[in-house]
Amino acid sequence: MIKVSNLSFSYNANDEALRNVSLEIPKGSWVSILGHNGSGKSTLSKCLVGLLSPTQGEIHIDDMLLNDLNLPKIRRMIGIVFQNPDNQFVGVTVKHDIAFGLENQCLPHDEMAKKIKHYAELVGMTEFLDKEPHQLSGGPKQRVAIAGALAMEQDILILDEATSMLDPEGTEEIIGLIKRLNKEYGKTIITITHDLSFAAQSDYLIVLKDGQIILEGTPKKVFAEEELLKSSHLELPFGLSLYNELKKDEQVDKNVLEALWAFNSEM
């Protein structure tokens, strides 16, 4: 469980990036935090992992207060993968990059090798272990960055705009991996995004605008507020907008509506 209470953050006196944000993220859920550029969503993600210290409010991870004293413990519980994985790579090869965090744990070499093999297999990167990360295309790069985070065996994983630089094929790869991590491995997943098609597949949505939560709920509940989303510069994909329009017509069969929703929320 992640609990955020009255969180505010300012980069300077005239720039309040977050204002009195309160939210709860249940263990084992997949939550998407939505917002246009400058909404505060990436600032929030950095606060959650302790990269930024809030000017006001508290964050609890599994009932543990995030502060300087608890930060080392918190970082063993929660990891983050940024939009551009090139900014995270530190290893000469994929194998060395996955191993980087493990080396800091002073694990025996054989145990480290097992973990590298396991997480490379999990993200489908076994055949690339001896490749340089920077030689890979977008989707494989993200999978390497995710493998490095998974190797730390944290229960919570934040993906900040993980698909924004990917083509449709790369996006589908990452979505499939997220679903597997969430459903099969019980990871709590937090995705930071402005892509509503992507967010439709998560369990719960939180919408930020100007550093404040303006809307939250299940995808169906949030996407029903189409005008409010538009005011936040978030456009529903055609299929989801069509669903909203057809829902207003009482003559449309409910089974048709449910099929349309299922199709668009699994794209």
Which residue stretches match the model-derived regions?
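Conserved ABC ATPase "signature" region
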Residues: 110-128
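Helix-to-loop junction immediately C-terminal to a conserved catalytic motif
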Residues: 49
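Conserved ABC transporter NBD signature motif
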Residues: 57-65, 74
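The feature captures the beta-strand-to-loop junction immediately N-terminal to the Walker
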Residues: 34-36
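Conserved ABC ATPase signature
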Residues: 132-136, 140
